[in-house]
Structure formats: C-alpha cells, structure tokens
C-alpha cells in the first residue's frame, strides 16, 4: 500500500466517527465515480460537486473508489449542515497537508498521493480545498426532512446559500407550511396523518423536502393525584396507585403500546393524612406513530376510605383448571357498592399466561375504585398458593393497605395481574369498593402474557354467560363461643355451614373467602390459675390456616388428618373472664371446614 493512500484511509475512518450523518435533502450533491488511471495507478475515484470535479483519490485499485464514495458521503453531510466556504481550510502536519471542514478532517495528503497528481502535497491540498470552497460558495439549499406531530408546529432551518426570496409550497392538505425570513426557516404545522413533500425554492434552486405528519403513540392528560390507604401505605402500594392513576390519564392510540414506571425506591411508607411526590417514566410507541416520552411527577395522598364490610363475595374457581385463554368470570357491581373477589385457578394451557382482573366502567361518568389485595403463587403447591394469598390479603385488610384506581367511562382497566407458569396455581383475593356511583363490572380472564397492561376503550360490550354466577351476599359471619375451665372443650367450625348464593340452589361449600369474626369468651371459675390453649385442626382433608388472634397473626403449617396446630395460649387467673377476638377466612387450595378448639393446656 502506498503511504499517501494509507494516510487518506486512516483519516477517512476518523472522520466517519465524528461527522454528522447524512439525513437532509440538498441541491448541492457530491457524487463519486470510477475513472481510469494509468497502468501504475489503476482505477481511481473522482468526486464531483454537481458537474464539477473537486478531487480524485487513487493508488489503491478498487479501494480508491470506495474511499471516494465515503468522502462524497461526508461532503454531502457537510452540505446538508450548510457548511460555509470559509470553513474549508488546509493545515500542515509535519510533512503532510490536511484539508479540513471546520475541525473535521476531509483528507490528508502526503508525497505519495501528491505524486499521483504530479504535484506536491501543499499544492494539491490547496487546489482541492479551493475546489471545495467554490462548490460550497455556489447558491444551494439544504433542509432536513421534517416530522411534525399532528396539532403541533415544527421549524426546519434552510441552510446553504439562499439567493432572493424563498417560496414554500405544500402538495397535500395534511400540513401547512410557511417561510420565516427572519430565522431562515420553514415552519410546518401538522393537520392530519400523512406523508407529503414541500417544494422550497429561491431564485436559483428548487428543493423537494419530505414531510411526515403523524400522531404520538400516546398523550398524557392531567395531572391527577393518586390515592392510597393504610397505616402506613408501603412503597409497592404507592407504586400501584401512581401507575394506575397515570395509566388512566394516558390516551393510547390504537395499536400502540406503552410502559409506565413509578420510581418509588426512595419513597418512605406513607402515613395517614400525609402525601409524597413520585417521579414517573412514561414511554409509548407503535407502528406509524411518533415515540412518546414523558416524566411527570405525581402527588400521592394517604386518604381515609371507610372500610365497611363488603356487600357480596364473588368466586372465580369454576373451572379450577383453565385449559385455554379467555374470559372465565364476570360480576357486576351495579347493585352493590363493594365486593370481595376470590380467584383460584391452575394454568393448564401448557404455556406461560397472565391472569387478569379488570374493572369495566359501563356508565357515562368516570369513577374510582378502592382496592385491597393479596395474591399467592404461582406455585405448584395449590394449598401454599391459597395460603399465601389469604395471608397477604388479611394482613393488608387489617392495616387498611390499599390503593385507588380511576376507571374512565367506557373503558376497561386491568386492576390486578398475576403471571402464571404452566401447571402452577394462582390464588388471590381483592376487596373492591366503588368510591363513586357507577355501573362497574369485574372480569377475570386468562391471557397470553404482556409486558404491560393498560386501560383500553371498549368497542362494544355484551354480558358474558358467567355474569351473576357465583355471587354470595353478606360474606361475613359473626360467631360467639365460650369455654369454661373445667367443663367441656369449645369447638368453632370454620366453613361447615355453606352460605347461599344469589342463584337458586347455589351453596358455597367450604365458605372460601368468607370472613369469620369470632368472639370467644374464656372464663376460669376455679380457685386455681389455668392455662387455656386455642388450636386449629382439620375437619377432613389437608388444610392451612391464617388466624388473627387479638390482632396477632398466626399461620399454621399444612395440617393433615388427626394433626393440630397451636394458635394461642392464655393464662387465666382464678375467677378471670376475658374475651378473645379471632378473625379468619377459609382459603383457596385447602380442604375446609376446619375447627378451632379451646381446651386446657
């Protein structure tokens, strides 16, 4: 390889990194063509500015043509940026001479490269630089292709050497365009979606510039504050509230997709009556849409929501094994202000899936729901999945930990999503309260997994065949019991008396999802101290339990026939009488009924 050509290639590669890419349209166009050299030099690459040759690279055979094409590409990039002739300079670097455009190297010339042209490096550098200055000094126009959002305006500078007045013509009604003489820019407003061209002309040149008018993939309206409850509300609940609020404010275009991420890592648990501000990252994209990026800051309040017993229990468990994707449960809140939904399903589709609980607003006004939730799984141990879901729900319910979710009119809002691996069980409980009157429907369906679940507008609605099934009003039972030291043991059955559903003949065997509030009176009429133990024992098959005893959570291990688990012990002084408050709930995946037993220790 000849030394001069080697230096040229080195600096061509360096310039490729630093020069701007070629994306604009220009009436000054550089091209590279192959020309014949003598037998010693071989093929050469000549660069033209329009019809005028400006430089010729040679000495390396076919590679010289490729090098010339690369130089032409970078000169076009400079033309598109409106390079001034005065920016073309030459500089000596030891024995060689370099042509620069501003601070960017175009080519470096040494004796070997100059010898091909029968001259020296300095003269060749000045000749080529003069050719480039002449080319960049001629009248020309350069404008980058324009992308304008519908309903917005964008300005694109006209670069180059303008001669005389400028006119701008549009070829379609999608956009409007005008020339800003003061800023030497064309201003374009997007009216509708479409692709067209602008014809930009001065006294010497005419240029066709592509224009695209497009919608953003989404738009964020608002802002609106988010709401949580709990003493305190933890970070994960704050995240749910903020993301649900932002999702309801995000107007997503058909076919677009989006992600919402609330940054709660540095947010401490939120006490009742307090508030915090949470940064959120929103991004949306889609085919034929403009990418949308926003970083709003959302205020979240820990507000007071009355926690009255719910009106109805809804159970999604038939069938327990879901063999296909689709809708498997629907319940209406039209006649209720609150509901508790228990779901317990096995993913038998053979593929990973998402179990989705969504709220549908069938009314003509926006509404808000308050949710308290607990989920278990995915797990191949269905008793463990049900136990974990019940434990999490009862814990959140006891502390009032929940969030509010806006539900815009005519939209379906995924309020709770659980991923299920093949063969695994998902089990959970949601307590839902309507904070404003409305016609809400709750639906449970299995779906292929998605990276994010967002509200969507209903194109139409028709009730599912499941609507109104497996509904059980007043899902709370109060039980009074007593145990007297020295007398017979006390037994409290949990799940033995099935509550009735709204459909004739429907009974909820096991009372899964029903809250039991038990007042157990313990008395010691003897003259001696006594210790009373409270235990849980299965009523038939294997079962687990979660019991809240005087505000203390107790979880049992997996109980089998003829086994038992201690729940609490109380030391009673002679003549002492005390009442123990117990709350529990039959949980999915276990065999209920079970029994609580009070007996002497």
Where are these regions (language model features)?
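N-terminal targeting peptides and non-cytosolic leader segments immediately upstream
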Residues: 25-142, 149-152, 180-185
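Extracytoplasmic soluble-region selector
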Residues: 135-220, 247, 256-264
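A short beta-strand micro-motif common to beta-rich folds, especially ectodomain repeats
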Residues: 192-204, 276-284, 428-430
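C-terminal functional regions that serve as terminal interaction/effector modules
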Residues: 273-275, 282-289, 522-601
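Short aromatic-acidic-glycine turn motif
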Residues: 303-310, 365, 375-392, 540-550
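Asparagine-centered strand-capping/turn motif at beta-strand->loop junctions
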Residues: 345-353, 358-367, 371-373, 377, ...
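Intrinsically disordered, low-complexity Pro/Gly/Ser/Thr-rich segments with frequent PxxP/GP/PP motifs
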Residues: 387-423, 551-581
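Terminal connector regions
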Residues: 421-457, 586-601
